[in-house]
């Protein structure tokens, strides 16, 4: 282990020395031989790329186009460090990337996160460790993503599950969580996060799963619908529809980001707060 660390450090030092006395092409060749850089995305490092489009798979209205030269170069620098993989991720893709070369469009699917084989198409599979979508999104002024989105989105749902768990305990109900219609937040929801959330939800209610297509086959459906947000304020309604007992309960969530943390308030069933 120590020998491996020393070897890695020595390699970095050597590259640093070479960088001082040689051109970038020499360093790039070394990186390629070490497997730190790939030639496949070389076409991004040229004027042949007219534009790069990035489309959310969950929110079809969320698509942005990259045409600016420095942004395309940034994309190339990230993808050139992708590692060739043998198998693609088994999670649903979060984005579709299309590289328009004029006479050809190269299409890739991207699973956000460090999941192996998370950038792929029908013929090639790569692992991208960096969040390539954030490089672009962070420069979009119209994005008002709530701070610590994963926490403020999934935490209230888990808290509602804890509230309803006693009434569902020991009942042979098929329970589904429906977030597919939560249009305002779909652009921020990613497969790796859903996997973690589902695991946490199953610890509270074992017979629960995410609704994939239709709610028809479920006895209890928990629907999440955002009612407004900005970076510091968040409101959502979580509806629990028990088809077996013909009941419906709505939990109103109001959260404020203060002193570097979210203060979350969840109402009693069907009691709308005054600040809603």
Model regions and ranges:
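Bacterial Sec-type N-terminal signal peptides, specifically the leucine/valine-rich hydrophobic h-region
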Residues: 18-21
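Function-determining sites in protein domains
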Residues: 24-276
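Bacterial N-terminal signal peptides that target proteins for export
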Residues: 1-10
């Amino acid at each position: 282990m120590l020998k491996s660390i020393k070897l890695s450090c020595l390699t970095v030092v050597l590259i640093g020395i070479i960088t001082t006395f040689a051109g970038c092409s020499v360093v790039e060749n070394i990186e390629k031989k070490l497997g730190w850089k790939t030639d496949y995305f070389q076409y991004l490092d040229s004027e042949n790329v007219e534009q790069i489009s990035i489309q959310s798979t969950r929110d079809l209205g969320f698509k942005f186009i990259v045409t600016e030269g420095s942004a395309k170069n940034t994309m190339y620098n990230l993808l050139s460090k992708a590692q060739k993989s043998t198998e693609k991720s088994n999670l649903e893709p979060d984005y579709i990337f299309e590289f328009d070369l004029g006479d050809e469009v190269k299409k890739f699917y991207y699973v956000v996160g460090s999941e192996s084989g998370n950038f792929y198409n029908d013929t090639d599979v790569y692992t991208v460790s960096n969040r390539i979508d954030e490089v672009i999104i962070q420069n979009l002024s119209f994005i008002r993503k709530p701070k610590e989105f994963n926490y403020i989105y999934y935490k209230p749902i888990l808290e509602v599950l804890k509230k309803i768990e006693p009434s569902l305990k020991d009942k042979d109900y098929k329970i589904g969580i429906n977030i597919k219609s939560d249009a305002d937040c779909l652009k921020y929801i990613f497969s790796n996060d859903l996997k973690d959330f589902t695991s946490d939800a199953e610890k509270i209610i074992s017979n629960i799963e995410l609704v994939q297509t239709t709610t028809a086959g479920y006895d209890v459906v928990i629907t999440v619908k955002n009612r407004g947000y900005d970076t510091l304020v968040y409101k959502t309604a979580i509806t629990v529809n028990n088809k077996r007992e013909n009941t419906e309960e709505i939990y109103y969530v109001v959260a404020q980001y203060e002193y570097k943390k979210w203060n979350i308030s969840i109402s009693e069933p069907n009691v709308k707060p005054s600040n809603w």
